[in-house]
Amino acid sequence: MDPCGNPAVPGGDCPQTRGPGLQGSSGQEGPLQGICVDSSHSEHEDRNRMSEELIMVVQEMKKYFPAERHTKPSTLDALNYALRCVHSVQANSEFFQSLSPRGARQAEATVYNLEELTSLASEHTSKNTDTFVAVFSFLSGRLVHISEQAAWILNSKKGFLKSLHFVDLLAPRDVRVFYAHTAPTQLPFWNTWTQRASQYECAPVKPFFCRICGGGDREQKRHYSPFRILPYLVHVHSPAQPEPEPCCLTLVEKIHSGYEAPRIPVDKRVFTTTHTPGCVFLEVDERAVPLLGFLPQDLIGTSILTYLHPEDRPLMVAVHQKVLKYVGHPPFEHSPIRFCTQNGDYVILDSSWSSFVNPWSRKVSFIIGRHKVRTSPLNEDVFATRIKKATSHDEDITELQEQIHRLLLQPVHASASSGYGSLGSSGSQEQHISVTSSSESSGHCVEEAQQEQMTLQQVYASVNKIKNVGQQLYIESMARSSVKPVMETCTEPQGSDEQKDFSSSQTLKNKSTDTGSGGDLRPEQHSSSYQQMNCIDSVIRYLTSYSFPALKRKCISCTNTSSSSEEAKPNPEADGSLRDTEQLLDIPEQETTTPSADAEGGVARTLSTAALSMASGVSQCSCSSTTDHVPPLQSESVAGACEPWALRTKAHVTAEGFKPVGLTAAVLSAHTQKEEQNYVDRFREKILTSPYGCYLQQEGRNHAKYACVVGAGATPKHSRCAGSERRKHKRKKLPTPVDSSSSSAHLCPHVRGLLPDVQHWSASVTSPCATGLALPSALVVPNQTPYLLSSFPLQDMAPHGVGDSAPWGAAAECPPLSAGPHPVSTFPSAYMGTFMTVLLHNSPLFPLWPASFSPYPFLGATGPSQMAPLVPAMAPDLEPTPSDHGPRRVEENWETHSEEEHPFISSRSSSPLQLNLLQEEMPAPSEYADALRRGACPDAKQLCVTGNSGSRSPPCATGELATASVQQESPSAAASGSSASSVHGSGSDYTSEVSENGQRSQDTHRDRAFSGAAEESIWRMIERTPQCVLMTYQVPERGRDTVLREDLEKLHSMERQRPQFSSAQKEELAKVRSWIHSHPAPEERQLQRAMSPVKTEVQLVTLQRPVNSVQQKTPVEQL
């Protein structure tokens, strides 16, 4: 074998001479062989020596192989790992050298010579005998300078340390940690740190821990001791180098056991840890090092169960169960646990636990533990070598880890914080705002019923389902899940004794928040975080950027359109009433007593000033249990009046606010928290006044709500103040059809109190318990464009309620109404309610009245050729109102304003996509489809009552839906209130046949109604629905140029709001954030190229801006 062909031979020949020989060149092969033969003996010795050295190097490299790979490394693996390390060091060196010559960091660096480094080291090491200073070069890795006392601390010779690489002193398993924390680009300058007041308290870099050994004898067993290292960047000018070279100055401090002198005080033996749901350490506090003996890198990535005593490991299952139970609450304490230290002994820890919940997935992301050492270990030297090897039960640990992981995989539905529980994170402990909760202030309170809230993912899924699959398929899917909850909500018996215990101070204060029967209790509103609100704001902005066409109609004109964008605009008049409500929240409430008595209890009813002020401009919900959604504006006003949280008003700025404060990190952090809080408050006000206000309400998706026409012994719900609890009420029963010949004995006792022999409106009608009738405060003229009629001023309402109330049939005695505009919400298109009645949620709770009859006889009748339009936008269901409105008495003003809607019309928002209906129940089929198509129906059939759950009474058949018509009434029926046969004076009204002993019959009737609902198919109803009512959503394509242009305009408007800093503030900001000089602004050209290959007008405008000038400026200069 040719010795020159062996790659282990030292490279004495140049590549030009050796290369052709390796390629097989015959011309040079002879001379080379002659030279090798002449010097064969000497080269053989050199080859053997080099082989031995190479073997020793390979064996040494195998010691530095990563400890994660449990298999014994081969020679090839060790060489590949060494090659990767060399490439990594070269890349770091080249990167730093390319940054230093022209970067801003070179100008900030201070150059030191060796004498200055010696004085610097002696200055800092004299204060602590366990600390030394070591300076090593980033280019060569060798020590440039080391303190004199380092040899004594490391128990080695001075000359030995000066000739070493600093990495040679480290334990092999800590080399990677050392390199990760000493990257030159992330180190602070030493001269910047020396300007600090304290050396250790205000250190700008996070310290790390490594094990360092001393001694130069390879035969002795190395003993590594833990050290705390603080790295800094310096430039050193040495005689051997013509230019200053970058170096790392490290302050190295030896760590002693916390239980040996000088001992850590008992009350300060505290540290924190963080681990995943799989019980794997994520972070360990540096205070744990002298208490446990483990370095942070020893624990991170390992299981916490490995270090617990085998008998204490099952306790972690109970701990995590309690973590899941107390999510969002303050940290809780559990049983003490025994934790193994590095020397093998156990310490007893008193631990408190809390968790962090991901606000999007609603799952526990990690668990935080705060531990305090109760009992110290037997061997106080926690860094001592472990004598006996710990026995590990891998199977038991794995089984417990899987059990805990499965436990924490379930989402959290409680009103939990989206931050660190109660650990003091910004915005995590805000006051909860309840915009949907309402209850009675009674003496007997029960705990609030919990129900699952709708997460953001469910909202996204529902929106995508509507857009992609279609409205009909969405209704069908919701139908399957609506039957079972309906059956569960109708099991409580009806009671009459609890109707008398309501507090008179809460009668009408929060009347608009009545959302269901007494059993449909709602939990308090979850307080969303800044990130959640920001995401929802983006979703709403995306949805509102669409332009939706009008409904397709055949009745008048197929091309008749109505813009839905005006419906989503906030009403300026409503905003004014909101500001008035905010001012009312800060003054004591003055209540005006209404001299009315309940029919049974005789409890006096009072009117809150805040509630009265909202009655004129905000739609009031009925006391009936049919109302599902609350008008967003009203909900916010009442929530502010009832909860301790109030809308933030602009406070007067005091002189203290203008005190000059330096721009420090604390000031920037406080400013960021303040801006986030202001954004959350503004967004909450915006979202509650928008058509999408239902996203922040905890609405039950499948809770059924029923309405009895005359109250059927119903007890209305009243809002309560925060801190009080709710009283459980008996549920209202399903309404039943009543024949026109029914007498007053068939009505519930509540109604008999409302219908005396004189047939006039009793004062108790205005009370919240009189749920039988409620006139709308803003009526609509039945034309293509709805016109508002008058709403009387607020001060005219209160005095009237008793005395000369208008009779039911007296139409000629009422004064005419004025036609002035009033602050009422915008109306939707004229046929929106018809569509929503058929395909969306609620069917109307009274049939389409014939042309010759009106539900309000004293207001006249509607012509046969006109269609009854809608009531205000918050109640999109169809309510027939007359056009020829006659005079009306002033006494009916309060009845109009206190009962905004008919008690059987739910208050809903008419947003373009009807997104608020995603959380509600299935609609019932429409009873008046053909009646709408034919205008007026001469033939009449009796229709049954339907509730919000979509159930129908037994007399209704599916085949009769398309041909159902309304029974005609004679004009004399309008004045037949004296017969007390029905509340509206009509046999075809939705009246409730509830006798005094009718509880059992209603239960039987309700069960049959629900059983029939499950058998019907929604497609049978859709097939019989006229085409003029059906509508399909068509989402048009958005103009990209328009959207980009609008975004650009908004960005330009935001530029004026950028903070302007003075020169002194810029310098102070640069001192806090030193990187701000070296990192330029991002290039706009790359963003434009990544956006689209086609350049639009907006992109061309952006590209024409002077981008180069912006790139040359640092962030400080741009400020």
Curated annotation (Swiss-Prot):
Principal location class: cytoplasm
Sequence ranges of Polar residues compositional bias: 429-442, 491-515, 989-1001
Assembly, per entry: Homodimer. Component of the circadian core oscillator, which includes the CRY proteins, CLOCK or NPAS2, BMAL1 or BMAL2, CSNK1D and/or CSNK1E, TIMELESS and the PER proteins. Interacts directly with PER1, PER2, CRY1, CRY2, and TIMELESS; interaction with CRY1 and CRY2 is weak and not rhythmic. Interacts with FBXW11 and BTRC.
PAS domain ranges (all copies): 120-187, 259-325
Chain ranges for the short sequence motif Nuclear export signal 1 as given in the UniProt record: 54-63
UniProt cross-references to SUPFAM superfamilies, sorted A to Z: PYP-like sensor domain (PAS domain)
Domain of life: Eukaryota
Region (CSNK1E binding domain): 551-750
Gene name per UniProt: Per3
Cellular compartments per GO CC: cytoplasm; nucleus
Function: Originally described as a core component of the circadian clock. The circadian clock, an internal time-keeping system, regulates various physiological processes through the generation of approximately 24 hour circadian rhythms in gene expression, which are translated into rhythms in metabolism and behavior. It is derived from the Latin roots 'circa' (about) and 'diem' (day) and acts as an important regulator of a wide array of physiological functions including metabolism, sleep, body temperature, blood pressure, endocrine, immune, cardiovascular, and renal function.
Name of protein: Period circadian protein homolog 3
Span(s) of short sequence motif Nuclear localization signal: 720-739
PANTHER family in the cross-refs: PERIOD CIRCADIAN PROTEIN, PERIOD CIRCADIAN PROTEIN HOMOLOG 3
PROSITE patterns to which the protein is assigned, alphabetical: PAS (PS50112)
Organism placement in taxonomy: Eukaryota, Metazoa, Chordata, Craniata, Vertebrata
Compositional bias ranges of the Basic and acidic residues kind: 885-903
Organism name: Rattus norvegicus
Domain PAC: 334-377
Region of interest (CRY binding domain), residue spans: 1037-1119
Low complexity bias spans: 419-428, 970-988
GO molecular-function terms, A-Z: kinase binding; transcription cis-regulatory region binding; transcription corepressor binding; ubiquitin protein ligase binding
CDD domains linked: PAS
Pfam family for this entry, one: Per3-like_PAS-A
